[in-house]
Amino acid sequence: MVLIRVLANLLILQLSYAQKSSELVIGGDECNINEHRFLALVFNSSGFLCSGTLINQEWVLTAAHCDMENMRIYLGVHNESVQYDDEQTRVPEEKFFCLRSNNDTKWDKDIMLIRLDSPVNNSAHIAPLNLPFNPPMLGSVCRIMGWGAITSPNEIYSSVPHCANINVLHYSMCRAVYPGMPAQTRILCAGIQTGGIDTCSGDSGGPLICNGQFQGIVSWGRYPCAKPRAPGLYTRVFDYTDWIENIIAGNTDASCPP
């Protein structure tokens, strides 16, 4: 475990130079230790950092652009400098994607389903988050969380995950900010129009939880982070529930939503 802590410290230093493509939460506060039992810390020794969400004992959901070599997945972590007895580490056994082209990760299908090499055990600091059973509603209050940058562009990283609240916004608000964004995608637009709160470098792949439901995966957004009238883009999890459930059930040839 000492090696893990050393790697974590090196990772924080290396991430000082990361771009938002590996999107901490700006404008938030330290998460309550009991509110992120499903949150996975995903990284490798090269310094690439993402988050993920445990959806059952054997599967983690994250962003496709978080794919990396030598990936390690840590569960039950709160403070990177303090070890808990129930922390668990896994590596991917299999990875599943919906991508048809590299451009999909920008505008659509930025989703990766990971089967772990062995099931994790539920504990005081580890428990899965269910998939959504309803689509998100416009204006919903949503929770974001992660170990990413808490300042931008001069990035500072925290050893604990930060949490904050944002809202689901009309899709047109994101189209107005990001030129070339298609008229329809499987993306959620979410943020605070006045700025000051946002996901940022190191948060990619983490959950967007709206009214208690896992509705989005942190995908990408404008950099520097947390600027006014620059909401973030999140993969809409509800649209992929059939695909996810089919893969988990063993139907590895399941079709992604068009």
From Swiss-Prot:
Function (record text): Thrombin-like snake venom serine protease that cleaves fibrinogen beta (FGB) releasing fibrinopeptide B. Promotes capillary permeability-increasing activity through the release of peptides from the beta-chain of fibrinogen.
Keyword match Cell inner membrane: no
Tissues expressing the protein: Expressed by the venom gland.
Active site residues of this protein: 65, 110, 204
Cited CDD domains: Tryp_SPc (cd00190)
Any one GO biological process: proteolysis
Ranges where the Peptidase S1 domain occurs: 25-249
Protein name, as recorded: Thrombin-like enzyme CPI-enzyme 2
Principal localisation: secreted
PTM note: N-glycosylated.
Lineage per the UniProt record: Eukaryota, Metazoa, Chordata, Craniata, Vertebrata
Enzyme class per UniProt: hydrolase
Natural source organism: Gloydius ussuriensis
Assembly with partners or alone: Monomer.
Cellular-component GO terms for this entry: extracellular region; secretory granule
Propeptide cleavage-removed residue intervals: 19-24
